[in-house]
């Protein structure tokens, strides 16, 4: 059941991240967010402090392929630099969705949520706990394991696994 009612605008949530690459943990959060919102905008953040393995466009295509059946309900956008909360407002979003893997994630995310709330009171932060089976994975760990020839087949979609193999073992 989403936050949408018949007399209101469709509910929109923004799920930001670098998604370099998208993992099954990310997919789990997006699927669960769809139960809360009519539309989920997956916002690919450009982080100047990180050197991504995949271009923004490659990440966009990677994510769209994961959700071909949900076209229209899941929209993937590359976010230009700037405040995420402003992007959320521009998209008509009611909430920023964040996945939490551990208590250590909460400290950082809590600070961001408070700052976003100070900047724009109308946009809520919603925290979804990562499903237990994905709690230990991150995009960085996936890249490291793949680069060193480890098996990531049950941690990412098949097309993502192939793309990683192409990057590391052309």
From Swiss-Prot:
Keyword Ribonucleoprotein carried by entry: no
Keyword Transferase: yes
Entries under InterPro entries matching the protein: Cyt_trans-like, PPAT, Rossmann-like_a/b/a_fold
UniProt GO cellular component terms: cytoplasm
GO biological process: coenzyme A biosynthetic process
Gene3D superfamilies attached to this UniProt entry: HUPs
Top enzyme class: transferase
GO molecular function: ATP binding; pantetheine-phosphate adenylyltransferase activity
Protein name as annotated: Phosphopantetheine adenylyltransferase
The organism of origin for this protein: Desulfotalea psychrophila (strain LSv54 / DSM 12343)
